[in-house]
């Protein structure tokens, strides 16, 4: 049996095709909540210059203390306004819309945000 060392997200479609985000590396360094979006202040900034379908603060990934699974949620917590703000165009996993309540990712899942598609993988 294959030993899983960690989890990552690989961009499969979009301006940064092939880019790899090592999610487990973030978790190792104490980051259990990762933000994804167009703005550079996200822990996982996604470049989308051809359109603006990816929100500035699009979605959130969260892991357990053990790092054995990840949950994706549409939107991000906005500290200043003290409110959860959903993305403009939604977050999808395998073409199904994800809400703020979240979805537990499985290896091979395809995440779509705007025109960008990413695959959840293990290594």
Task: List PLM regions with ranges.
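Intrinsically disordered, low-complexity acidic Ser/Thr-rich regulatory segments
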Residues: 1-52, 62-67, 106, 111, ...
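Forkhead-associated
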Residues: 45, 59, 65-110
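Short, solvent-exposed loop/turn segments enriched in Ser/Thr/Gly
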Residues: 55-57
């Amino acid at each position: 049996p294959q030993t899983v060392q960690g989890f990552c997200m690989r961009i499969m479609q979009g301006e940064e095709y092939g880019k790899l985000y090592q999610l487990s590396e973030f978790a190792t360094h104490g980051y259990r909540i990762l933000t994804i979006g167009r703005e550079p202040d996200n822990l996982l900034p996604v470049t989308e210059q051809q359109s603006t379908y990816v929100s500035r603060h699009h979605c959130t990934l969260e892991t357990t203390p053990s790092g054995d699974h990840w949950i994706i949620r549409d939107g991000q917590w906005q500290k200043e306004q003290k409110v959860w703000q959903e993305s403009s165009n939604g977050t999808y996993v395998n073409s199904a819309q994800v809400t703020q309540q979240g979805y537990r990712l499985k290896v091979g899942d395809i995440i779509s945000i705007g025109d960008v598609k990413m695959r959840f993988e293990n290594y």
